């Protein structure tokens, strides 16, 4: 029996429930990670954050919005928003399985077989199994349709060869969902398949990529005759593009809700910093702080609108375009609030504020660049002609 076996009907009762649980549980070693684990700081206290993930799962806080028949809580959009708000206010530890809960889980619910759901959803809900995403390649980043990693059937197994890059948390994940090319003469979107691949095997090599912040969240992942079962295809062979795009819609659609947990914390820290060093007294800084706060509120409203409409479609690109630009701007604002201190490394590593600035330089690129998002919106939402090639 979990803490959340029965959700209260009232949003206010639910808020009180969330507040009470977070107050009682963000203590001890978990309280030591308050405000940590954000951009450029992902390696901090990882073992503690894994334990926190399991605590969330044991109490029933993972999969709040999943349908009850799949082990979720069937929580309304408003309750999911309340949980995000209270999580932020409690400064609870940063999550380690966003990929599993918010991306793969809903994708399996939408496209997976009953056997796949039975096998994988409980591990996500309990916090016991972590997932990473194998999409980008050296020559297939924003142009994802150029995937070159291949998989061939060998009896009842797929044999996978190729390379993925920018694989977040691959070094600490047990499974990876991978887009591969299974029809060898196919081009672009055709002939792709969505596979679930175990990471703990000799055919998978993970090499960390040291970022400009000094952190190592991202990795190169090499598949050399790696294997996975024939039953590990999500959807059907050759139709992986549709599954991958459905997942990207979830990523870009829920990101303004899930990521706002960290965003609000960062904005609060910037405001506190501006007050403490009197930067808030400068009219330009004060105006930019207000603009950032307004942007945060707009992202919340857009998240509610996106989630209330069911599975996000191409309009989810609005979310990615919005938060990528907003977050990069927050990093720039942080440096201006710091002033000349922003150019000096205080110790052997960058400060959290400097890490935020350095990390957010990539926000308008990864997960689909701003240029790609504008093309999607122009072509699929506004009906404009495709960009000439």
Regions found by a protein language model. Give the residues of each.
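Amphipathic, small/basic residue-rich leader segments at the start of a protein or domain
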Residues: 1-98, 119-126, 269, 276, ...
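Glycine-rich phosphate/cofactor-binding loops in nucleotide/flavin-utilizing enzymes
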Residues: 3-4, 78, 82-83, 94, ...
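Glycine-rich beta->alpha junctions and the first turn(s) of the following alpha-helix
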Residues: 3-7, 13-14, 204-301, 363
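C-terminal helix-coil-helix/basic helical segment that borders enzyme active sites and/or dimer interfaces
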Residues: 30-40, 275, 279-286, 297-348
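N-terminal glycine-rich flavin-associated loop
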Residues: 96-115, 141
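A short, Trp-centered hydrophobic/proline-enriched beta-strand micro-motif
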Residues: 127-135
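A structural signal for short hydrophobic beta-strand segments in well-ordered beta-sheet cores
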Residues: 149-152
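A short core secondary-structure module
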Residues: 156-157, 161-207
């Amino acid at each position: 029996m979990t803490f959340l076996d029965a959700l209260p009907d009232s949003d206010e009762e639910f808020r009180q429930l969330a507040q009470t649980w977070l107050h009682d549980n963000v203590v001890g070693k978990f309280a030591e990670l308050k405000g940590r684990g954000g951009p450029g700081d992902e390696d901090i206290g990882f073992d503690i954050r894994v334990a926190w993930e399991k605590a969330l799962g044991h109490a029933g806080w993972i999969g709040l919005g999943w349908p009850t028949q799949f082990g979720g809580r069937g929580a309304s959009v408003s309750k999911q928003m309340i949980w995000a708000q209270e999580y932020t206010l409690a400064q609870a530890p940063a999550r380690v399985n966003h990929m599993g809960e918010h991306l793969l889980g809903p994708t399996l619910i939408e496209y997976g077989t009953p056997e796949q759901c039975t096998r994988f959803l409980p591990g996500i809900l309990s916090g016991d199994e972590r997932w990473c995403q194998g999409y980008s390649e050296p020559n297939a980043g924003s142009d994802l349709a150029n995937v070159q990693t291949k998989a061939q059937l060998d009896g009842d197994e797929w044999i996978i060869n190729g390379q993925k890059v920018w694989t977040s948390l691959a070094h600490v994940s047990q499974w990876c969902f991978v887009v591969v090319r299974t029809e060898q003469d196919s081009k672009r979107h055709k002939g792709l398949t969505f596979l679930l691949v175990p990471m703990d095997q000799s055919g998978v090599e993970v090499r960390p990529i040291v970022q400009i912040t000094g952190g190592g969240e991202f990795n190169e992942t090499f598949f050399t005759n790696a294997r996975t079962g024939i039953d590990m295809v999500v959807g059907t062979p050759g139709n992986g593009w549709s599954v991958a795009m459905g997942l990207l819609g979830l990523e870009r659609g829920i990101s303004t809700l899930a990521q706002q947990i960290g965003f609000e914390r960062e904005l609060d820290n910037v405001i506190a910093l501006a007050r403490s060093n009197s930067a808030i007294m400068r009219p330009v800084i004060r105006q930019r702080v207000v603009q950032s706060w307004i942007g945060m509120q707009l992202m919340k409203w857009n998240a509610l609108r996106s989630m209330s409409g069911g599975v996000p479609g191409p309009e989810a690109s609005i979310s990615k375009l919005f938060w990528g630009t907003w977050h990069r701007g927050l990093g720039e604002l942080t440096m201006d609030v710091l002033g000349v201190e922003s150019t000096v490394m205080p110790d052997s590593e960058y400060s959290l504020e400097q890490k935020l600035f350095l990390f957010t330089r990539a926000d308008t690129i990864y997960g689909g660049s701003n240029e790609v998002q504008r093309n999607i919106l122009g072509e699929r939402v506004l009906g404009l002609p495709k960009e000439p090639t």
